[in-house]
Structure formats: structure tokens, C-alpha cells
Amino acid sequence: LKVPVPVDDVPAAVVPFRRRGLVTVVRLPLRNADARQEASRQLRELTDDGAPFELFLDRLGKVTVTHRVGGRGRPSVYTRKVDPLFTAPGLKIQQITLRRRMRLIMVTAAVHSERAHEAIAVGRESGPLTDGWQALGDSAVVSVAVPAGEPLERGRLYTFLPMGAQPTCPVRGFLNAPFHTDVSRRTMAESTQWNDLLLDTVAEACTQAVVLRYGCTCHQRSAAARATSASY
């Protein structure tokens, strides 16, 4: 990558964006056939509904992806709708609706601050983590999303965007956390106490969500039974 610079003359390909009122347009020319092939591969991967890129981007409103071939292209629009289901200190459960009405139940949990600082300190002392990781000690969260209907055959790890197919996700869902990864953010780095803590937090969050779900159901049934008994 090179440092972007403003241009004096607006390229013809950018003019339609200006007419639509867009303020910032970044145009990256592809230098050769290999670069074009790689860009096409990444575009196909990005728009693969098997691992929706927009799932954990909670500030996202809408993304339109248009792949033009021979001057023609059909836009694909990606949106994200959130419906809160349950909120408790350090935990929230939401229903996420994506394009094509794909619905998922998402559980998001805060990482315990004391355990986070301890894991980061260990990682800094042993080498994998740098000083910049300290900021996550009080703000790290993990999320796991599962389809509202049939479960996935295989899960996928995310670091905000989908990682590669390896390593294997421990749940049949989509799992997002600020993992320590390689530079490409596609594979896990070596085993670290930090990554282990994030996975433990996911397991604890799922357990808590199940207890809350069925605990509420049992409480409601008990209340209904008491009301029925009282009526007799």
C-alpha cells in the first residue's frame, strides 16, 4: 500500500459518486492481471453469505458492493437490523437480521477486566502482545451468533471480519473476539493466555444465556401454575 494523495482532476469513474453526493471516494487502481485476480478473489470471499462480513460491524448502516465486468454490474446491498431481546450487566442478547432475511441470535459479553489485564500482562512479558493491547483490558467484548433456524454445519471465527477457514471454530456459529492473530488476521497466532481467556468468556456467555432463557421459562411456568392453583 502507498500513502493516498488527493487528485486535481477527477477520474471519469469517480464522477458518478460525486453526483450522488458522496464526500469521500477512495479509488485503488489494480496494476496487473495478478492484482486483478486477487481483488476478484477477495471480493468473492467478502460477499460469501456463508460468512457474512457485516454481522459484527455494529456501526454499519449499509454497504453496496458492485462487481463490474465489461461495464456491467449488479449491486449487492448489505444491511444489518438489530432487535434487543435481553440486557443484563455485562451481557446482552439480540436478534440480528441481515440481507435475504437471514436471522441470527447474538450473545455479547464483556471480558472480566481483572482477568483481561492479567492475560495481557502475561502476553506482554512473554512477547506476543505489545503495549497497545493494554487498552483492551477494560473494554474487550466477545460475541457469538447462531442462526435462528437450522444450525450451521461448521462455525467461523471472526476478528470483526471473518478469519480464514482455519483454525476450527469451537461452536457451530459465528464467534467474534479481539483475538491475537497473524498480520493478515486470517489465522490465530500461537496459543496465548489472552486467546484462551476470550474463548473461555464465550463459553461462559453461552452458558449464562441458556440459564437465563430456561430460567425465565421455568419461572413463568411456575407463576402460571401458582395462578391456576389460586383460581381453584
Question: How should each PLM-predicted stretch be described?
Answer:
Residues 1-232:
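GHKL/Bergerat-fold ATPase module
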